[in-house]
Design a protein with these regions (language model features):
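...with weaker cross-activation on analogous glycine-rich loops/strands in unrelated enzymes
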Residues: 195-224
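Surface-exposed patches in mature extracellular/periplasmic domains of secreted proteins
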Residues: 170-174, 199-201
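Active-site nucleophilic cysteine motif
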Residues: 162, 174-193
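Boundary regions of SH3-family modules and the immediately adjacent low-complexity/disordered segments
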Residues: 1-10, 23, 30, 34-39, ...
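Short, conserved secondary-structure segments in the cores of folded domains
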Residues: 28, 100-101, 210-213
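Short, well-ordered loop/turn sites that connect or cap secondary structure elements
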Residues: 26, 32, 105, 216-217
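Structural motif
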Residues: 36, 109, 220-221
Length: 224
């Protein structure tokens, strides 16, 4: 069953029982961000649901972090954009004085967009149906394939995406400006440019990464 992440940041864990008892004692393995699609792969246990991410990672996420059923299916087919500000608030009005509909959407979160931007603001819809406005410059296209065909431009775009996380503290399993790990940084930098690589720091068959010699390193290459 398809589902959509319905909160700003949803922790992914491998131990649902321990997480249900004490989240602080259960290891975080990944973070799923608002608007990301997942596949539910089994039955809920202690309010946790087993899922597979769109990039093949598996784990357990809180049941109340998911939107399922027809609403999820309807939202997934709407035009979407991705947040590229480190943090962004969805407001009730297209001005800074608007009340906050949803606070703290992280870099990498996804929203559905309604129409074209007006006066620097973009009308958006969240997975749960709430609507509001984001600054248009806080959003970028959600690329289904590499954002640039020219290799040098693509490499530069990947490096620029990585720089958006400058100053972010290290957090095992993290994937946002609140905290990110090494493979999370690599994955998000590539994903923002339309390339989906494996979540962990390793070469994995079926993902667009191949070995390169350190003497041939160029901008945008990964060093594991």
């Amino acid at each position: 069953m398809q589902a959509v992440i319905n909160v700003a940041i949803a922790p992914l864990t491998t131990n649902p029982a321990l997480w249900a008892q004490n989240p602080q004692q259960s290891r975080l393995v990944d973070e799923l961000l608002l608007g990301m699609p997942v596949e539910i792969t089994g039955e809920a246990e202690q309010h946790m649901v087993p899922v597979r991410t769109f990039y093949g990672y598996t784990g357990w996420v809180a049941q109340d972090a998911l939107l399922t059923g027809p609403k999820a299916e309807e939202w997934l087919v709407q035009p979407q954009m991705v947040v590229i500000a480190r943090w962004a608030d969805v407001l009730t009005e297209s001005r800074v004085q608007g009340a906050c509909v949803a606070a703290g959407l992280p870099l990498g979160a996804r929203v559905a967009v309604q129409g074209d931007p007006e006066d620097g603001w973009q009308a958006v819809t969240l997975p749960d149906g709430r609507t509001g406005y984001l600054r248009a410059d806080a959003l970028a296209p959600l690329y289904p394939q590499p954002c640039e065909q020219d290799q040098e431009k693509l490499r530069a775009a990947i490096a620029q995406a990585a720089k958006r996380y400058l100053g972010t503290p290290y957090r095992w399993g993290g994937k946002t400006p609140a905290g990110i790990d090494c493979s999370g940084l690599c994955r998000m930098a590539y994903l923002l440019c339309g390339i989906s690589i494996w979540r962990d720091s390793e070469l994995k068959e079926g993902y667009p990464i191949h070995p390169a010699h350190v003497s041939d390193m160029r901008v945008g290459d990964l060093v594991y």
